[in-house]
Amino acid sequence: MDIDQYMTDLGRRARHASRAMARASTAAKNAALDAVARAIERDAQVLKDANARDVARAREKGLDAAFVDRLTLSDKALNTMVEGLRQVASLADPIGEISNLKYRPSGIQVGQMRVPLGVIGIIYESRPNVTIDAAALCLKSGNATILRGGSEALESNTALAKLIGEGLEAAGLPQDAVQVVATADRAAVGKLITMTEYVDVIVPRGGKSLIERLINEARVPMIKHLDGICHVYVDDRADLAKALTVCDNAKTHRYGTCNTMETLLVSSGVAAKLLPPLGKLYRDKQVELRVDAAARTVLADAGVGPLVDATEEDWHTEYLAPVLAIKVVDGLDAAIEHINHYGSHHTDAIVTEDHDRAMRFLREVDSASVMVNASTRFADGFEFGLGAEIGISNDKLHARGPVGLEGLTSLKYVVLGHGEGRQ
């Protein structure tokens, strides 16, 4: 296969389809989503058979159990796909909305209309559910998409792509609006991320090595995040019961997510009261604690252990594991300085009852999501009321934070006149 020619053809067809998608009605888009949902219900066994072949090959390669679990399309996973499609269909369609319409002294009206981005390339690892999630969000937001999943899920993704194509056709929409890259050749990714004439944005969903490669090689703009080094700062004016709840949930609710707390900062004025019960809670949940000297003193005196001395590297680390770095700081200024220096601009939280300090934290912490008295785990499209998300961005341009339907659109200016000419 000539990868360069193959990817160019996908891009050309996607660009053509994107024009039809931009003018597609809400009814047609919702009909396509419903048709795909019904096709998955109808062909569940076909999908599971294709997926079983992917799973068998993954096991033959010796891939670990967690990887195989993410790859597997169980009945529950298929039901979740169907529910997700119908949920996206129920969301309000942002395309065509005109906002901020106002009269100018010249007599014209000026506003902004929400429009699709165009063609979105999505690169992800071996999670077949992303094929449906991404296709649904791109479809509802009026975009065409080129999906490049992990090679280990190729048969699963190909089977899903067939059903997506059927759904689009049934609704009178172009099948090329959603295309799955049907090759495991890594050169396909290299071509996709440089096709500026056909692809408007890349959304990568994967590990750090993938994101780093794309940062170095992509010519197409990206919506991405590299790390989730999330912090919780417990102020000396915190409610300790709230602090225990927030710190427990932020770390132990799920270890492997990008919005999990990786560093806990505790004000020196409250460390002696908070750290002993919190340390025992983490110990009971088998969380490894990597602590600075001040935190070690308090925790050791309370009989909490074992403890590991934190190094400079720990403040830079996204563990994605039951490991937590703890540092005692002098107060709010030191906490904000630490977060802005070591953080990844993803999600950070303060626990405090002081309104002025909370507002300072919200203003001065340079992150996509900043929280007061709430777990960092809430940094999620569903929890934010976006209905669904295609990913989380810690960049500052275009989309920032959880990226839902609106994040896959842009605004263009519209002018309504009555024959006016500029004086």
UniProtKB/Swiss-Prot annotation:
User: What InterPro entries does its record include?
Assistant: Ald_DH/histidinol_DH (IPR016161), Ald_DH_C (IPR016163), Ald_DH_N (IPR016162), Aldehyde_DH_dom (IPR015590), G-glutamylP_reductase_CS (IPR020593), Glu-5-SA_DH (IPR012134), GPR_dom (IPR000965)
Q: What GO cellular component term, any one, is given? A: cytoplasm
Q: Keywords of this protein's UniProt record, alphabetized?
A: Amino-acid biosynthesis, Cytoplasm, NADP, Oxidoreductase, Proline biosynthesis
PROSITE patterns for this protein: PROA
Query: Where is it predominantly found?
Result: cytoplasm
Disulphides:
none
The pathway where this protein functions is:
Amino-acid biosynthesis; L-proline biosynthesis; L-glutamate 5-semialdehyde from L-glutamate: step 2/2
Record field: catalytic activity: L-glutamate 5-semialdehyde + phosphate + NADP(+) = L-glutamyl 5-phosphate + NADPH + H(+)
One Gene Ontology molecular-function label: glutamate-5-semialdehyde dehydrogenase activity
Where it sits in the cell: the answer is:
Cytoplasm
| Superkingdom to which the source organism belongs | Bacteria
Enzyme Commission numbers on file? 1.2.1.41
Q: What EC class is this?
A: oxidoreductase
A Gene Ontology BP annotation from the UniProt entry:
L-proline biosynthetic process
Q: Where are the transmembrane segments?
A: none
Keyword set includes NADP: yes
* Any Pfam family: Aldedh
Record family assignment = Belongs to the gamma-glutamyl phosphate reductase family.
Q: What does this protein do?
A: Catalyzes the NADPH-dependent reduction of L-glutamate 5-phosphate into L-glutamate 5-semialdehyde and phosphate. The product spontaneously undergoes cyclization to form 1-pyrroline-5-carboxylate.
> What NCBIfam families does this protein's entry cite?
PRK00197.1 (NF001221), proA (TIGR00407)
Designated name of the protein: Gamma-glutamyl phosphate reductase
Origin species: Burkholderia lata (strain ATCC 17760 / DSM 23089 / LMG 22485 / NCIMB 9086 / R18194 / 383)
Protein's gene: proA
